[in-house]
Amino acid sequence: MQYLVFDPRFGAAGDMILSALLALGADRSAVSRAVSAVSNLTIEETERRGIPALSLKTNTGKAHRTLEDIIQIIDAADASAEAKALAKQVFNRIQKAEETVHQSHHVHFHEVGADDAIADVLGSC
C-alpha cells in the first residue's frame, strides 16, 4: 500500500493542490472537462528550483456568489456524481465557517466565489 501525506499547515493554494494531483496522475482531460463549467484551464510543465512541476492557469472571472449560485455551477459541471458531491461538501463547509465568522446566515462568497476558486475545488474533487 502507498501513502500520500498532505500537510497544509503552512498554507496551500487551490491551484497548487490541483497541480500536485495532476502531477500524481489525475486525468487531465477529466479535470479540464470538470472545470470548463466555470473556467478554461491551461496546464504547463515548468521547473521550480530545479524540480519539475506543473503550473495551472484559470480565468479569474466573476466573484461575489451565493452558495446556491455555486451549487448550480457544480451541478452543470461535466464531472462525476462523486466529484460533484464532494465539491458541494467543500462549499457547504465553507458556508458554515463564513456564517460562524460573520454571525449571519446571509453570506456571500467573495474570493471563494470567484471562477478560479470554484475551478480549483471542482478540479481537485
Feature map (PLM): residue ranges:
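Glycine-rich nucleotide/cofactor/substrate-binding loop typically near the N-terminus or early
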Residues: 23-102
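Glycine/charged-rich beta-loop-alpha catalytic/anionic-binding loops adjacent to active sites
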Residues: 1-3, 100-111
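N-terminal phosphate-binding or glycine-rich loops at protein starts, especially the Walker A/P-loop
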Residues: 1-39
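Conserved phosphate/anionic-ligand binding catalytic regions in large, soluble enzymes, centered on
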Residues: 6-19, 109-125
